[in-house]
């Protein structure tokens, strides 16, 4: 439940790497405790078949969102090297989205500050959106003036709390890769400066069926049950 409150001392829901998985996104939103803001660290589209529905969710609710590498590719201006599975998801998204939706993806910022400057969003790394920054690499030097840096891209949930602030990856809503197939997200408490990583089960079989019906690669379906 997202409450209509703007307050720098608040609870904030953080999501990333939805990747067109509306079934998982719906499960996350149903599971999420009351928060006063929702933030997204990019890659709204790709891999799974509900690209338009996921774009419209974040767009209609004006969820602060940064551009992920799949978002950039679908918008048509990316040199990021994709494997065949990722490329198939990008092409499917390009076919499913209208020009206005693709333009919206292409206009997303690379970095964004929210919550009165207390939270900064970046997809892969603060200086390189294509760089993978795994939780083992989290260190205070990643932080600038913000209290919390939110990253995505790796699909691996994790966070570290330092004297200087917090670095957190909420994990992937739509395609987890940390061995847990449940959809991942996190809740930040900017009052206590704490992170609650959360997981929620969703109907993986229904998503697998939709992936196959869309003609996407089989591996995109099978990997969901393993969380890899």
PLM segments and residue spans:
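Conserved hydrophobic/aromatic beta-strand scaffold that supports enzyme active sites
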Residues: 111-113, 121, 159, 185-187
């Amino acid at each position: 439940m997202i409450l209509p409150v703007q307050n720098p001392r608040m609870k904030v829901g953080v999501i990333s790497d939805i990747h067109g998985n509306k079934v998982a996104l719906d499960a996350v939103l149903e599971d999420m405790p009351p928060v006063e803001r929702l933030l997204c660290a990019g890659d709204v589209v790709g891999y799974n078949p509900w690209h338009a529905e996921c774009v419209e969710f974040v767009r209609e609710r004006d969820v602060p969102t940064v551009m992920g590498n799949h978002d950039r590719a679908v918008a048509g201006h990316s040199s990021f090297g994709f494997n065949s599975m990722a490329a198939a998801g990008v092409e499917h998204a390009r076919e499913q989205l209208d020009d206005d939706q693709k333009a919206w993806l292409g206009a997303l910022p690379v970095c964004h500050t929210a919550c009165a400057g207390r939270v900064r969003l970046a997809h892969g790394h603060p200086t390189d959106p294509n760089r993978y920054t795994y939780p083992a690499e989290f260190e205070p030097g990643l932080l600038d003036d913000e209290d919390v840096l939110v990253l995505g891209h790796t699909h691996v949930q994790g966070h570290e709390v330092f004297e200087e602030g917090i670095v957190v990856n909420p994990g992937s809503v739509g395609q987890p890769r940390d061995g847990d197939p449940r959809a991942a997200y996190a809740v930040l408490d900017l009052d206590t400066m704490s992170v609650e990583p959360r997981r929620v089960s969703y109907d993986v079989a229904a998503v697998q069926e939709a992936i196959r019906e869309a003609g996407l690669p089989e591996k995109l379906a099978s990997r969901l049950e393993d969380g890899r």
